[in-house]
Amino acid sequence: MNSGVRMVTRSRSRATRIASEGCREELAPREAAAEGRKSHRPVRHPRRTQKTHVAYEAANGEEGEDAEPLKVPVWEPQNWQQQLANIRIMRSKKDAPVDQLGAEHCYDASASPKVRRYQVLLSLMLSSQTKDQVTAGAMQRLRARGLTVESILQTDDDTLGRLIYPVGFWRNKVKYIKQTTAILQQRYEGDIPASVAELVALPGVGPKMAHLAMAVAWGTISGIAVDTHVHRIANRLRWTKKMTKTPEETRKNLEEWLPRVLWSEVNGLLVGFGQQICLPVHPRCQACLNKALCPAAQDL
């Protein structure tokens, strides 16, 4: 009787242990439940299986056990490093208008940081479709009257127009300057926004101005500032996958491949190059070190 109880108890214990450990291909030989007797069940040997490794492309952002990340080659233009090195040589004197009259040279260095940032933004708003010399002249006249948020809001439109004339589209810029300045006073306590998204939301402020404002006013490189010079030269050198129609399209193309460490340099470098050698009309190809490397040289 006692032997029967032991057999039932051990049998239940074995079943419980199997259930708790999960399904297995086979169990090790066990002692029989009866005292001193070996189990008469035949011992099963494990089947030898060979692993099959299947390579597949992971879907929906999931990676398989044997899947490796797919490497997508990054497009980059031919000879761009040599072209850039040549432009650096041609710009080594830093004697282009942008080098003396750019946005980083138009503010009052003795003013408070908030006022300096405001003056940087205004100089960028004035610079659109305007030569650097004309922008610098307008900024000098504005600064002579005390260029602050408060002074601009107190200046009537006619007077402001006379001060900034002859910058391009000066009538529209009078309106944009007044509207933007009012927004800065109401929403930003007289300072300028510290993000590209907020800057481009201001009247008269485009992507190029916003990225330059972030760099000059805030010391942050948020993107490549592309104006007409950078847009023109990037297309002539084939620094874009295809010919682009707008500066903003050019910016997106450049940022896809140009190393970020060069983003802050490329604007001033190409703007000055475009002012002195790679001119919009009748470029000075004979004086350009990239004459043999420029795809557009033979067409200009």
UniProtKB/Swiss-Prot annotation:
Its EC number is 3.2.2.-, 4.2.99.18. Keywords: 4Fe-4S, DNA damage, DNA repair, Glycosidase, Hydrolase, Iron, Iron-sulfur, Lyase, Metal-binding, Mitochondrion, Nucleus, Transit peptide, Ubl conjugation. InterPro entries: DNA_glycosylase (IPR011257), Endonuclease-III-like_CS2 (IPR004036), Endonuclease3_FeS-loop_motif (IPR003651), HhH-GPD_domain (IPR003265), HhH_base_excis_C (IPR023170), HhH_motif (IPR000445), NTH1 (IPR030841). Widely expressed. The gene is Nthl1. Residues 1-19 form a transit peptide. Ubiquitinated by TRIM26; leading to proteasomal degradation. Residues 187-211 form the HhH domain. This is Endonuclease III-like protein 1. It holds the Pfam family HhH-GPD. [4Fe-4S] cluster binds at residues 278, 285, 288, 294. It comes from Mus musculus (Mouse). The active site is at 208 (nucleophile). Its cofactor is [4Fe-4S] cluster. One of its GO terms (cellular component) is mitochondrion. It comes from the Eukaryota.
